Amino acid sequence: MWWGYSAPLDLRCEIEEKEETSKSLEVLIIGASDARHIIKTLASSYKHSDCSIIYHIIEPTMEQVARSILLLSTCLDKDLGLQEATRYYLEIMGNTLLRPATAKYLAKHSKLLADTVTQTIDCPWLNLEKLKHKDRDQLEWIFKFWERATREGVPIVDYWDRRIRKSLKTRYDYRDGVFDWDYHMILKPRGHSNLTIHEYRFWRNNGIAFTWIEGEPARSNPTLLNNIIPLGDGFLHYAYLGDITNGPFFTWALNEEKENVKLRATDIAEREVMRVIHEIRTKEPFCEELVAAHRDPSILNGIIITEMPSSEIEYESWTKYNKYEKQSVPWISIPSTKILFHPLSTLDLLKNKAEYKEKFDTIWIAHNMTKQLPNIIPLLKKKGHILIELRKYLSELRKEDLESFTKELKSTAQVCGLREIKSFNSETHTIAQFCSN
């Protein structure tokens, strides 16, 4: 729900260069959750010819829209150091608890983003005009809730533990054995070579995926909560409803290259996020030495955090930050990029609108949105590419489930008039590629 299960893609590589599409491109992304494809494509722009791109984004919930905006904004924040921005991004994306510095940034930045929704502060790359007024109101509530919940604390680790107890039932007391089984018998054979058992087990127990020697996570991450509704002077929200079996290790931490150096999934993710932020800022290739200095091989066989912080720290209230200065707009300039969010309800409507017929050069679809294929195909240009996320890294699915998904997807694609670019199956691939006839 809060992250994807496939590596970030440079979407320019998926578009066949043609004269009529070389200066302006339209891309539709459905259900990606974490803006990784936009970030990767932005970072790789210096490798391609100059081109303006409009990204049209559809997410199932407004909380996912808000997280996408926050994660994009963090990567584009020119006031942050390179490693600082990288770790803020990874912690906010995948940890139930944040380091104090990250939590302070989240509280301050949430206030800034709430002001961008109301257009008190201008955000040049963000376009919310397609959202309904109630959606924009909800988006503003979410950012305000994050700012307040980060200061006041929410019991997210307790929410996490309740989910684990409900899921495992009588096996809860033997949960480490369950986690080890899922790791060794399911995830490891599927090919994630850098995810260590210590990282995976610690995340399954507590929801903390990415850890470093410098600083311990102690403040709750409210961006992982959903169904946020204002009530009087406060807010109502659901407890944690996201993924508790797979983890945020299958996007930036996926490493397809064979390396002699053994690294944790955290190290790979940090390197790849640092790479894209560096390339967005400098439009130059990334130097590996920028990230290698702090690594210690001894951490491979252990975890950096040995015990969870006291819940009193998680709930400790902070004072409210002063209003963000209006003239302080922190984003890097990306003049050739616009990011346009649409409400989920438009998926059923766009195919009937003339201006969207054969509009998009490339469409990317999450694994849980494939039922929408019949609504999406009319939006794709002739010879355009459609990319569909597969379910390789969903540990709750067995071999027969993956085979069934592959078979059903191929059948649906054929009925919709799509042609496979490369043969695929869900056991060995993370993306299926199709082309319109």
Annotate the PLM regions.
Residues 1-437:
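Domain-level detector for long C-terminal conserved domains
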